[in-house]
Structure formats: C-alpha cells, structure tokens
Amino acid sequence: MASCMRSLFSDQGRYVESFRRFLNNSTEHQCMQEFMDKKLPGIIARIGEAKAEIKILSVGGGAGEVDLQILSKVQAQYPGICINNEVVEPSAEQIVKYKELVAKTSNMENIKFSWHKETSSEYQKRMLEEEEEPPKWDFIHMIQMLYYVKDIPATLKFFHGLLAASAKILIILVSGTSGWEKLWKKYGSRLPRDDLCQYVTSSDLAQILDDLGIKYECYDLVSTMDITDCFIDGNENGDLLWDFLTETCNFSKTAPLDLKAEIMKDLQEPEFSVKKEGKVLFNNNLSFIVVEANV
C-alpha cells in the first residue's frame, strides 16, 4: 500500500492547488503582513542610502503577494527612487499570476520588474557561467523556498556574496517551534520523499549560518493553519490540506490506513495543534531570519 504513495511535487497542478488551500486556511500571509508592517521598515532603513536605484532580488517569488508588500515598504522608505525588482521563480503558472497582480496594482510606476523562470540553483549556475561578475543586490528575500534547495549552505553562501554594502537578506521559513518540525521528524521517513524537497526549519538554518560564520537575527511570529476539514471524511478541502501537510499526492486515498490514523491522532495533540471554538488549528509558526552583509 505504501508504494502507492507518491510525492505531491510529481503533480504540479495539485501542488499549486493544495498550496492555495493552505494559504486560504492559514494565517501565513497575515503573519507575514504583520512582520512587514512592524519590523521590515527598520530592517530596510539603510539599504537605499545615497543610491539612485535600489536593486531587489526575489528568490522564489511565487505569485507575488508578499513581494508587493515588501516593495510598498521600500517605496515608503525611499519615495521616488527607482526600484529594480528581479524575480527568480520556477513555476510558469506562478509567474503569470505575479504579472497579473502587478498589472492590477497601483503605484508601481517607479518599479521595473523582470522575471526569470528558473530555480535558485539554475540562477546561481547562470550567474557563475557568465563572464561578468554577478550583480550586487541591496535586498534579497527568500520566502518559504529553502525547502526546495539541494545544497542550502552553498546557496546561502552564494547569495550572501551578492549583497552590496548595507544590504540584507530576508529568509522566511517554518519555525523550529512549529508543528511542522515535529511532523517531519516523526513521519518523514514513512512519507514519499522527493529530491525536490527537504525538511528544514529555522533551527536547522541557524546552525548552518553559525557554521558559515554569517551574522543574522531571528524573529518568530505565531501563525496557525485551520485543519478542521482534515477530520471530515471525503472533504475536498481537507484532502488537499492533507496533501500539503504530508507532501503526498492524494494522501487520503493512497496512504496506509494505520499511517493516516496515527497522523490524524497526533495532529490533535497539543504539541501539534490547539483546539479553539470547535476548530483544530495546526501550529504554523514562522521564523523571519535577517542576514547582514559583511562589514
């Protein structure tokens, strides 16, 4: 029965849909918005000093919702200054959505957008193969994308080397205190692994940055994901959330019954979720890691 399970990443359409359901059922973007409102202005306070243009690199920009939040904060900090925003994103579908979002968003006049349909590894390879030195950036952000990188230390070292003076990297990924950390550690070996994705949290990232000798600050914010529908048999929304939780395509239909029963039981335990007003809210806490350029 276990052999019937396959990685969610083997079906791009279902992955995108399950990710959309995750966003609709979680406070992920609200949590990010809170960080952008309260913390980001201080973080970007010096990135554009005495510059005619601010260069921003979005690695794994997705459909652009969070990117545009970031850009609005940069615009507010540096009114009238031109912004060059380059996006590295492997999904053609997400790039189309990103472009549609830009087209219907006002106050984008001083921002130049360019998109590259490639992974961060492909971007890195392309930059290293070009004869000229790779461009330097004033702000690089990597939002919920390090799970899809094979060599995280090498990736961090490469992008850290692209920072201009006073520049920063913002990395967002799940916290080491989240339910994801516990779920992956307990069940990862029993779920279909894909070399496209690896289990990594802020705890792992902090260790990697320490080993590289790179300075950083880490902020944790509370986020939840409503997984109540996962406990309703045959619920379409619940089935897609199951897929996202386990990174397994059609998990509800293909997983061994004992595995699903075990995970279902655990997901209701306090170390994974809280129960509130009849809902089961999975711990989706996020970490925001700010990496500084070398002085």
Curated annotation (Swiss-Prot):
Name of protein: Histamine N-methyltransferase
InterPro entries, per database record: HHMT-like, SAM-dependent_MTases_sf
GO MF, any single term: histamine N-methyltransferase activity
Task of the protein: Inactivates histamine by N-methylation. Plays an important role in degrading histamine and in regulating the airway response to histamine.
EC annotation from Swiss-Prot or TrEMBL: 2.1.1.8
Protein localization: Cytoplasm
Family label: Belongs to the class I-like SAM-binding methyltransferase superfamily. HNMT family.
GO biological process, one term: response to immobilization stress
Reaction catalyzed: histamine + S-adenosyl-L-methionine = N(tau)-methylhistamine + S-adenosyl-L-homocysteine + H(+)
Oligomer status and interactors: Monomer.
Sorted UniProt keywords: Cytoplasm, Methyltransferase, S-adenosyl-L-methionine, Transferase
Keyword S-adenosyl-L-methionine: yes
PROSITE patterns per record: SAM_HNMT (PS51597)
Gene name linked to the record: Hnmt
Residue numbers binding S-adenosyl-L-methionine: G60, E89, Q94, S120, I143
Pfam families: Methyltransf_23
Top-rank lineage group of the source organism: Eukaryota
SUPFAM superfamilies per record: S-adenosyl-L-methionine-dependent methyltransferases
Chain sites annotated for binding substrate: E28, N284
GO cellular component, one term: cytosol
Protein source organism: Mus musculus
